[in-house]
């Protein structure tokens, strides 16, 4: 877990130990429809990870795969690691019977937006809405 949390902190600039502890508790084991995949080099150094799950019937959407986290070490980008991770999670989604993959990306995150577009993802007919809550 520490290698994933460290990679995330190097890229995001934010330490999220409690978040990663929760993620590993929920997604670290093998459960149908939940995926936490990692890529390592020959020395067991973490190169990247991707995580997602099958979600069903959110606002009448049939079951689909959701990717909600991906990171690749900056030294390993453009080496196909992200593509390999994305293809692996898509293969996992196919094996459990879903045929659509979705994600949410910040408009400001051009790197991740470009990556997902390079994988064939595009805007869908669903729109994300949000509001700020008063304290």
What is each PLM-predicted segment?
Residues 1-4:
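A short beta-loop-alpha structural element at the N-terminal edge
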Residues 72, 78-91, 114-118:
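Conserved acetyl-CoA-binding loop-helix of GNAT-fold acetyltransferases
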Residues 117-127:
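Conserved acetyl-CoA-binding loop of GNAT-fold acetyltransferases
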């Amino acid at each position: 877990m520490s290698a994933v949390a460290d990679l995330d902190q190097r890229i995001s600039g934010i330490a999220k130990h409690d978040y990663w502890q929760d993620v590993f508790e929920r997604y670290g084991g093998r459960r149908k429809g939940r995926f936490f995949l990692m890529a390592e080099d020959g020395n067991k150094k973490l190169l990247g990870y991707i995580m997602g799950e099958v979600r069903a019937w959110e606002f009448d959407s049939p079951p689909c795969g959701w990717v909600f986290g991906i990171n690749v070490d900056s030294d390993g980008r453009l080496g196909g690691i992200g593509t390999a991770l994305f293809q692996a999670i898509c293969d996992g989604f196919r094996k459990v019977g879903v045929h659509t993959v979705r994600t949410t990306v910040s408009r400001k995150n051009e790197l991740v937006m470009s990556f997902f577009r390079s994988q064939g993802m595009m805007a869908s007919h669903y729109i994300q809405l949000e509001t700020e809550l008063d304290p």
